[in-house]
């Protein structure tokens, strides 16, 4: 369905990090720089024989189009709940020791970290599988969206999934108008 109405977007990004943590799970949405070392420290355990760390960064192109920056937004209360459910499921499914999922909100320039996933498990194969599955589940299920800005001013809103079609937008960082 398309419409000729213009829709303005003003990000409602929390000014501080939003966290849900237990002894074995840490999920976080934050407008601040991501701390992969803190995530690694969280998942460290004497019963873990392997720790896997994934750091996703903003690349400078998408489908051969030059990207100038990304901006992430979310429905934060639901996204935190979804991330926690993902972490709980992965922890049980792969018999992991601990897991951390940290996602950036707001502006994320080229080369900066947008997501950190750390997983520990008694054995390396479980940690590898859990780390990859955590990333895919987060991209597929978490209520997080990104505005991918291209050089030249045009941008695309899309779910936080690679290769999915988005909604074209024009404009700067404030008051972005979506074309439907």
Swiss-Prot record:
Q: Name one GO molecular function term.
A: molybdopterin synthase activity
The subcellular localization recorded is:
Cytoplasm
Q: Which Pfam family would be a valid example here? A: MoaE
Q: Does the keyword Repeat apply?
A: no
Q: Which reaction does it catalyse?
A: 2 [molybdopterin-synthase sulfur-carrier protein]-C-terminal-Gly-aminoethanethioate + cyclic pyranopterin phosphate + H2O = molybdopterin + 2 [molybdopterin-synthase sulfur-carrier protein]-C-terminal Gly-Gly + 2 H(+)
**Could you tell me which pathway this protein works in?**
Cofactor biosynthesis; molybdopterin biosynthesis
The answer to whether keyword Cytoplasm applies is yes
Sorted alphabetically, the keyword list is: Cytoplasm, Molybdenum cofactor biosynthesis, Transferase
What are the boundaries of the region Disordered? 161-180
Residues reported in the UniProt entry to bind substrate:
123-124, 139, 146-148
Spell out the GO cellular component terms annotated for this protein, sorted alphabetically and separated by semicolons.
molybdopterin synthase complex
Catalytic class of the enzyme? transferase
Tell me which EC number(s) this protein carries.
2.8.1.12
Q: Which GO terms describe its biological process?
A: Mo-molybdopterin cofactor biosynthetic process
Tell me which family the UniProt entry assigns to this protein: Belongs to the MoaE family. MOCS2B subfamily.
| Function, in words | Catalytic subunit of the molybdopterin synthase complex, a complex that catalyzes the conversion of precursor Z into molybdopterin. Acts by mediating the incorporation of 2 sulfur atoms from thiocarboxylated MOCS2A into precursor Z to generate a dithiolene group.
Q: How does it assemble?
A: Heterotetramer; composed of 2 small (MOCS2A) and 2 large (MOCS2B) subunits.
Q: PANTHER family, from UniProt?
A: MOLYBDOPTERIN SYNTHASE RELATED
Q: What is this protein called?
A: Molybdopterin synthase catalytic subunit
Question: Taxonomic lineage per UniProt?
Answer: Eukaryota, Fungi, Dikarya, Ascomycota, Pezizomycotina
